[in-house]
A protein has these predicted regions:
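Intrinsically disordered, low-complexity acidic regions enriched in Pro/Ser/Thr
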Residues: 1-176
């Protein structure tokens, strides 16, 4: 279940964990102090007839052989809100103030994972439905800097969009 697709990104001293549709100051994004450098990106997937993306793991290249996603711990201060059905990890200094607009043609074929527009300062995973949130798990080195991040897409809560419920709400508003 590990390393189904590995890529590299570069992160600075501050890293943003967010839905890319949000601006930098959105309450449901998280920013952490990270060990700067190259990070290996891994999809954690359940393989089979219909592969399912279970999580996204980034680990500093110096720790790649030492740290697994199961070594990360929940950071209760980060509630990663998801509105666009996407969630990612980005270098805070390069993340646009008003969020990222993506071209859907950049999506990967298997698990809808793709990089940020300039190719090296972040990674986004998508195709999760709509509104909700996901847990961010962190690993910190001896200096307290984050050197690995695991986004768990199996433990999040997001409500499925209910067309009938929405239509009923719209009808009620029209009647008033």
């Amino acid at each position: 279940m590990r390393n189904t697709l590995a890529n590299k990104i570069k992160l600075g001293t501050k890293t943003l964990i967010s839905d890319p549709c949000y601006d930098k100051n959105t309450w449901c994004a998280g920013e952490v102090n990270t060990l700067p450098g190259d990070y290996i990106v891994q999809e954690i997937a359940e393989m089979g007839k219909h592969p399912t993306l279970k999580g996204l793991f980034v680990v500093h290249s110096s720790q790649y052989e030492k740290i697994d996603y199961s070594d990360c711990y929940e950071d209760s201060l980060i509630d990663v809100g998801v509105d666009s059905g996407e969630c990612g990890i980005y270098d805070s200094e390069k993340y646009p103030e008003d969020g990222i607009g993506f071209d859907a043609s950049n999506r990967g074929e298997n698990y809808a994972i793709y990089r940020a527009p300039d190719g090296d300062w972040g990674v986004t995973a998508g195709n999760f439905g709509g509104d909700g949130s996901y847990k961010a798990y962190l690993h910190r080195n001896g200096d307290g800097k984050v050197d690995a991040i695991y986004l768990d897409f199996t433990m999040g809560g997001y409500g499925e969009y209910d067309d009938e419920e929405y239509d009923e709400e719209e009808e009620d508003l029209e009647e008033e």
